[in-house]
Amino acid sequence: MVKSSRFRFFSLAAWNWRLYRRGAAVLLGAATLLEAGLLFGCAGNLNFAATSYDALLSTSGAGVVFAIVLGATLVVAQAPLLAASSGKTRAAYTILTFRLPRWQILAGQTLATAFGMLLALAWQAAVWFGLFWPVAAVQDAVAGRYFGFTVSAAGRLWWAFATSPWFALVLPRTPEGCGLWAGCLAAVSLLAATVGVHRGWRRLLAFCMAAVGSGCCVLVAGVQFGSEGFGPLFWVRAGAPLTVLALLAVLAVPGALLALHRAEMAK
């Protein structure tokens, strides 16, 4: 760990990441194969030969896989802390051995979780971009004898990127979108990080709060799907879930810090 106690939570976050990176790699690898199979399956169907790439993401179920991956990443990122609190890891990894302010433990776990979420978003963007050309080639091959014209793959990709709400989720195109999803990412990462510092019924309560917070993010994403931009109507519809998410994040911090001070996860 670094010598400066002010920034030691960065080292803790890096340590946590190293402990769960294999699980994250397995998760993302399996999801990549599943999404590829779903997209190629739809692209090879004549009924979807003229379907836009954006519509394929929705029709094939690739978007659902993406949502599941984000939720699973939140769980996988907590594995080191949950193992430590249950005594299923090396004795050196325990709350009593961290000689740093307790808030830095929470900050480090939150940062490690947020990094995993960012990695999942970057992976998803890369997968969707990378699969576009082979999927488009399959569509063109299937529809070649039924249509007398084609649209360049590059043009279709640009149109999908410019108009698709799926791409807007993984690569926000406006300052409002970047700020919105940065806030949601920070809040849900914090809520997930608090689960591992509790035990017993408090852990169950923290898990429920994290689940509700994740549900709020899903609702916000749904509002974004049905809105054009971030106008007044969007903020009216998304105001309630965003408020609940913010309140949950604020309420979760005192309880988590108290649990850390009591060393509830130590054995």
Residue ranges of predicted features:
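Hydrophobic alpha-helical transmembrane segments of membrane proteins
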Residues: M1-A92, R102-K267
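Short helix-to-coil transition segments within interhelical loops
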Residues: T97-P101
